[in-house]
Amino acid sequence: MKTLLLTLVVVTIVCLDLGYTRTCLISPSSTPQTCPQGQGICFLKAQCDKFCSIRGPVIEQGCVATCPQFRSNYRSLLCCTTDNCNH
């Protein structure tokens, strides 16, 4: 009986995740915000457009469910899973 009760408690904790959600820096202001449910990965993407040599790369930060694929116009792409790690 104790084993069954312990199993139920563990399953409940895992399923509910104790209400914890990820916080990531969100562009354009780079302020920490709580990510929507299911989006537990922070990302930082720097990409170049035709004005990159003048103003530098365009920076995008946010929350995603899966890390975006790297593309040829990206200068860098960072995906991470700790709070506010995308700086």
Swiss-Prot record:
Citing just one GO molecular function, the answer is: acetylcholine receptor inhibitor activity
- Identify the GO cellular component terms for this protein: extracellular region
Where found in the cell? Secreted
| Expressed in which tissues | Expressed by the venom gland.
Keywords from UniProt, A to Z, are: Acetylcholine receptor inhibiting toxin, Disulfide bond, Ion channel impairing toxin, Neurotoxin, Postsynaptic neurotoxin, Secreted, Signal, Toxin
Q: Which InterPro entries does the annotation name?
A: Snake_3FTx (IPR003571), Snake_toxin-like_sf (IPR045860), Snake_toxin_con_site (IPR018354), Toxin_cobra-type (IPR054131)
Q: Which domain of life is it from?
A: Eukaryota
Main localization is secreted
Residues of the signal peptide: 1-21
Establish whether keyword RNA-binding is in the entry. no
**Which Cys pairs does UniProt list as disulfide-bonded?**
24-42, 35-63, 48-52, 67-79, 80-85
Give the record's subunit note: Homo- and heterodimer; non-covalently linked.
Similarity field: Belongs to the three-finger toxin family. Long-chain subfamily. Kappa-neurotoxin sub-subfamily.
Role description: Postsynaptic neurotoxin that binds and inhibits neuronal nicotinic acetylcholine receptors (nAChR) with high affinity (IC(50)<100 nM). Is a selective, and slowly reversible antagonist of alpha-3/CHRNA3-containing and some alpha-4/CHRNA4-containing AChRs.
Q: Could you tell me what this protein is called?
A: Kappa 1b-bungarotoxin
Source organism? Bungarus candidus
